[in-house]
């Protein structure tokens, strides 16, 4: 069609430097986000190939980390509230390069959903309250912790 546009989150690329690329492991900053819970009603696929559609950003906190070399086994992501109580956990890839895991802001282990919303009944527990959460990524012998913030939704 000739006028295509690629939309992608390049946040980790903006943070990359020569120093990071020589490290065996690096956890990038985590952008604070509110939980939106987008929903849509209707069949928007009736327009065929003439309808340009770009999906919304995922509804969750995106955790990006860099590995200089691929590691055996996956990454373990642990999310704790500010008092140190574990509220969620995820597993991630351990491939060389930038790896990405989405936390859908819900408690539990890999608890339902890829962060994309639609018009359907939600499965799993409701999202956690706004606030700061300690997010720890462990791969092989490497470990790093960052604060991830669920912001309050303001409309």
Predicted regions, residues:
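Short acidic/polar inter-strand loop motif in beta-rich domains
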Residues: 109-113, 139-147
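Hydrophobic beta-strand positions in extracellular immunoglobulin-like domains
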Residues: 65-67, 105, 139
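Intrinsic-disorder/low-complexity, polar/charged segments enriched in Ser/Thr/Lys/Arg/Asp/Glu/Gln
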Residues: 58-64, 98-100, 143-145
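Beta-strand-rich binding/interaction modules
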Residues: 61-64, 70-88, 132-136
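Beta-propeller blade termini and top-face loops
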Residues: 1-52, 58-61, 66, 70
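Extracytoplasmic beta-rich repeat domains
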Residues: 46, 51-53, 57, 102, ...
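Glycine-centered tight-turn motifs at strand-turn-strand junctions
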Residues: 86-126
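Primarily secretory-pathway and cell-envelope proteins
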Residues: 50-57, 69, 142-155
């Amino acid at each position: 069609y000739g006028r295509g546009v690629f939309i992608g989150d390049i946040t980790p690329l903006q943070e990359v430097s020569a120093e990071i690329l020589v490290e065996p492991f690096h956890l990038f900053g985590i952008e604070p986000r509110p939980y939106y819970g987008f929903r849509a009603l209707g069949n928007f696929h009736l327009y065929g190939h003439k309808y340009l559609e770009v999906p919304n950003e995922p509804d969750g906190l995106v955790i990006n980390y860099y590995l200089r070399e691929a590691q055996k086994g996956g990454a373990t992501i642990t999310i704790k509230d500010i008092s140190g109580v574990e509220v969620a956990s995820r597993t991630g890839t351990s491939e060389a390069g930038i790896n990405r895991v989405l936390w859908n802001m819900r408690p539990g282990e890999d608890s339902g959903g890829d962060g994309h919303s639609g018009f359907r009944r939600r499965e799993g527990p409701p999202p956690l309250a706004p606030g700061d959460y300690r997010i720890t990524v462990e791969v092989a012998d490497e470990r790093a912790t960052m604060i991830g913030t669920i912001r309050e939704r303001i409309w």
